[in-house]
């Protein structure tokens, strides 16, 4: 749904639905989207679409035309894509495979170009498009600074090749699309400082020169295009896990000239570590329910002196729980955003509220609810999927109406005109 006259859109990410082929994706969309839209008083309803590499290959001109006709018929529109997972994302062990192929590869580059081509076909006139993507690569894969520098270099070149493709799309089709790097724990870019360092050390100097040479531009013009077409996807769960202060992050990004193109509204698990061994046993029992085998659930521990310790996955962290002197753990597990507590565990919902409040001063056009873990939630947290998605929408809208007044009741108005 479009939330404001100036172009803010709210959706949920369809990566919550299993399905890698285009037929599976379309079947899910037809099952859930019209039913979900009917629960809201809105004429047009936005979609945050996740397409695997397989689906992008299958989604040819005829399929796109058929899909567009269905979207118009249903009052639906696509404005953002999730281009992070390339391959299978459900019903298999994903873990660190979600980072492959990474941004050093032609496969990732071509996949993202395919996504941009599809999104340009689907975008309504006058609506900007976004594609979120992985934070270049996965840090634990590399054991030397020289290896990492090579990854930064090749990733920069490949990102610029996509920017060239996007510039051409904008010039020839009138559709503006930006790629949004999505930092997360243990990603090659995992926090705001690393985002800024990547822009200042790699994207702007190396990428700017490469783009200027390719398009015969001045360095200033090339830098402007890079800043426009390479932005950041601020996932509230990810930034919370690494203990980032949203106020400081938004301020630092603005000062560095880095735009947040998309906000993924999601919550992580957080918990203070009790001193009593019996209480730690109870905590271990509660956390163990989230130590499932499909996705990585990175843990970041905070110590009294301010230092942080990162664990690759929750089972590894649980081995240290009895003896660790850390004061707090935060776990990368996207839990439903409408609850503040889960038994003795807490959520990082407060950071979502802070981010929503920041939108008054730092507008962002694309907001996407992203709780993709429904299938792997502990059984006691599972409810009817459609109802759960609706509750997340209701919570976001209610927070705005009660606290921020960014959108007032405008989400009810048919603001978007689809030809």
Which residue stretches match the model-derived regions?
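N-terminal pre-domain/capping segments
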Residues: 1-121, 126, 226-229, 370, ...
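Hydrophobic faces of well-ordered beta-strands that scaffold small-molecule active sites
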Residues: 8-14, 43-49, 78-83, 129-133, ...
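Acidic-and-aromatic substrate-binding clefts and catalytic sites of carbohydrate-active enzymes
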Residues: 18-26, 50-63, 139, 186-190, ...
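Well-ordered, non-membrane alpha-helical segments in soluble/globular domains
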Residues: 25-33, 60-67, 115, 149-165, ...
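Flexible glycine/acidic-rich beta-alpha junction loops that bind and position SAM and/or redox cofactors
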Residues: 85-94, 134, 138-141, 241-243, ...
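Active-site acidic/histidine proton-transfer and metal-coordination neighborhood
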Residues: 92-231
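Acidic/histidine-rich catalytic cores of soluble enzymes
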Residues: 169-318, 326, 335
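Flexible, acidic glycine-rich loops studded with aromatic residues
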Residues: 303-406
């Amino acid at each position: 749904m479009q939330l404001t006259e100036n172009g803010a859109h709210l959706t949920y990410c369809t990566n919550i639905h299993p399905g890698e082929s285009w037929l599976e994706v379309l079947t899910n969309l037809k099952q859930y989207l019209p039913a979900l839209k009917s629960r809201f008083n809105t004429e047009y309803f936005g979609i945050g679409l996740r397409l695997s590499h397989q689906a992008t290959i299958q989604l040819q001109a005829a399929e796109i035309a058929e899909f567009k006709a269905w979207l118009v018929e249903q009052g639906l529109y696509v404005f953002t894509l999730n281009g992070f997972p390339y391959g299978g994302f459900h019903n298999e062990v994903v873990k660190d495979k979600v980072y492959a192929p990474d941004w050093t590869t032609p496969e990732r580059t071509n996949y993202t170009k395919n996504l941009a081509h599809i999104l340009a076909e689907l975008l309504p006139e006058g609506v900007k498009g976004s594609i979120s993507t992985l934070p270049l690569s996965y840090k634990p894969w590399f054991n030397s600074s020289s290896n990492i520098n090579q990854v930064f270099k090749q990733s920069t070149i490949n990102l610029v090749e996509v920017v060239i493709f996007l510039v051409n799309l904008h010039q020839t089709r009138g559709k503006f699309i930006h790629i949004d790097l999505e930092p997360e724990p243990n990603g090659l870019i995992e926090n705001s400082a690393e985002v800024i360092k990547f822009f200042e050390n790699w994207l702007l100097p190396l990428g700017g020169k490469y783009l200027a040479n390719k398009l015969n531009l001045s360095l200033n013009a090339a830098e402007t295009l890079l800043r426009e077409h390479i932005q950041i996807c601020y996932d509230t769960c990810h930034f919370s896990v690494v203990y980032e202060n949203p106020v400081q992050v938004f301020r630092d990004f603005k000062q560095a000239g880095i735009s947040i193109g998309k906000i993924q509204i999601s919550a992580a698990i957080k918990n203070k570590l009790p001193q009593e061994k019996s209480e730690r046993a109870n905590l271990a029992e509660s956390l163990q329910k989230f130590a499932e085998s499909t996705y990585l659930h990175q843990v970041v521990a905070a110590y009294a002196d301010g230092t942080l310790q990162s664990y690759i996955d929750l089972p590894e962290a649980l081995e240290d729980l009895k003896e660790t002197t850390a004061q707090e753990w935060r776990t990368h597990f996207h839990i439903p955003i409408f609850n503040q507590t889960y038994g003795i565990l807490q959520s990082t919902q407060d950071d979502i509220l802070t981010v929503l409040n920041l939108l008054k001063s730092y507008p962002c056009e694309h907001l996407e609810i992203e709780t993709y873990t429904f299938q792997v939630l502990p059984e006691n947290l599972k409810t009817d999927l459609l109802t759960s998605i609706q509750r997340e929408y209701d919570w976001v809208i209610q927070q705005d109406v009660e606290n921020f007044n960014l959108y007032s009741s405008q989400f009810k108005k048919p603001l978007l005109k689809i030809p």
